[in-house]
């Protein structure tokens, strides 16, 4: 009985630590991408071309379905459109919304394809029918990781929501005075890249802070200190 309770506590603790580790990794990668925007754009562009080439080779060599492969290539063309305004993206833009739909449909169609093991009705009583080779778990997981999830996940980490902020003191010193300061001595706002991953993580963190306040706990965001 006690051992079972310990196993539940260990499972929950492991899940929480895993979630925090993934969130920390996403936060770090998002900050890293913000500092190296142009190399990230080139990497994503080449990755999209490479995955399209892989899909074509799978069609020719492994007999993947033509229509589904063509649909996946069309999805990657849609993903590529997000790079035109990289790293900034509008969450209500048609391209971004269409990309979200493509991610869901592409995952669903490929999952259905690999999970379909039924024999076609016209071949059920054919003794010479050779069923399609069923892919192993490693093959399916690798295909989904590289050809289905990699680019959407990379775009989620790399793309940024525009946020208008005041320029820093060093930026004001290095930039021209007429460009940074208006005639009314009011500093102009500039657009800063804020990664979508950071936006999501910060939103979740703020929600946890507000939820803790409801139960009478005060978390100071500057020091992450919990006070009653």
Swiss-Prot record:
GO terms for biological process: COPII-coated vesicle cargo loading; endoplasmic reticulum to Golgi vesicle-mediated transport; fungal-type cell wall organization; protein retention in Golgi apparatus; protein transport. The keyword Membrane applies. It is a multi-pass membrane protein. Keywords: Glycoprotein, Golgi apparatus, Membrane, Protein transport, Transmembrane, Transmembrane helix, Transport. Residues 1, 60-88, 167-228 are cytoplasmic. N-glycosylated. One of its GO terms (cellular component) is COPII-coated ER to Golgi transport vesicle. Disulfide bonds: none annotated. Pfam families: Erv26. The chain crosses the membrane at residues 2-22, 43-59, 89-105, 143-166. Its main location: Golgi. Glycans are attached at residue 115. One of its GO terms (molecular function) is COPII receptor activity. Residues 23-42, 106-142 are lumenal. The keyword Glycoprotein applies. It is found in: Golgi apparatus, cis-Golgi network membrane. Present with 1810 molecules/cell in log phase SD medium. Plays a role in retention of a subset of membrane proteins in the early Golgi compartments. Facilitates endoplasmic reticulum to Golgi transport of mannosyltransferases MNN2 and MNN5. Belongs to the SVP26 family. Interacts with itself. Interacts with KTR3, MNN2 and MNN5. This is Protein SVP26. The gene is SVP26.
